[in-house]
Amino acid sequence: SEMGEIKTLIRDMRIYQATSSLSRPIADATHDISKIAFYVLEVETEGGILGQGYLLSFHYSPNAIEGAMKDLKRFVLERKYHVYETLQLQQDYEAESEYFGIPGLQRWALATLNVALWDAWARTLGQPIYRLFGCSRKKIPVYGSGGWISYTDEELLEEVKEYQKRGFQAVKIKVGSPDQERDVRRLHLVREAIGPNMKIMMDANQGMDVPSSVSLIEQVKHLGIHWFEEPVSNTDFEGYALIHQKTS
């Protein structure tokens, strides 16, 4: 086939890891992060094209994550996949690894490989990836994420003003401090600093309960909060329904 002639079969996969300590630890409502582990998964086609996917895994279970990537590598190289067969490869591997559970480490490894395959396919065709996705938009909205709970007020405001200066239309701030008054005060400070036109989102990283979530929403809704991300555990469907029911 024409595709076969341009040598798109996956010939090899390589895994690299780097670990770095942060100059200053950061924290959200559920995590304290002092160092990060960073993985690169590289795919090589029979035509010699390289594609890379990146995984930021912070410092969690590096051996398990690397093991999941090595298991996936063995699976892929024992078969003949073209770099554009992203969906088929994912479906095959999910069927293969279903016994151990699809979410979690398996999905992390698959996602990193998926990015590497798209990269290799785009490089094979000599096109940027966004063209392969259809190119239907000239612009997409993006937001600046950060606002870590560990930030001082000065650091928080410096960050959101920098996002505004760079042209971001929205910022996302961490909430879920032990002292809710601090969350409320920080959100007020952000709104004062960036003015009325930028969107503000807040993210508790699943670190709050229903009463504290409802209380926070009521105290800051006049600030025009665009969304509230992960107030409670992502499997607490009843909790989310209650939060929705108790707030406007």
Report each predicted region and the residues it spans.
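Active-site mouth loops of central-metabolism enzymes
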Residues: 140-155, 204-210
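Catalytic domains of carbohydrate-active enzymes, especially glycoside hydrolases
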Residues: 162-174
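N-terminal small/glycine-rich loop or linker at the start of catalytic domains
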Residues: 125-150, 186, 193-197
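Catalytic core of soluble alpha/beta enzymes
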Residues: 173, 178-248
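Metal- or metallocofactor-binding catalytic centers and their adjacent structured scaffolds
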Residues: 12, 44-124
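Conserved, mostly hydrophobic/aromatic
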Residues: 10, 41, 48, 113, ...
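Structured beta-strand/loop patches that form or line metal/cofactor-binding pockets in enzymes
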Residues: 4-58
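Short, acidic/polar
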Residues: 151-163, 211-216
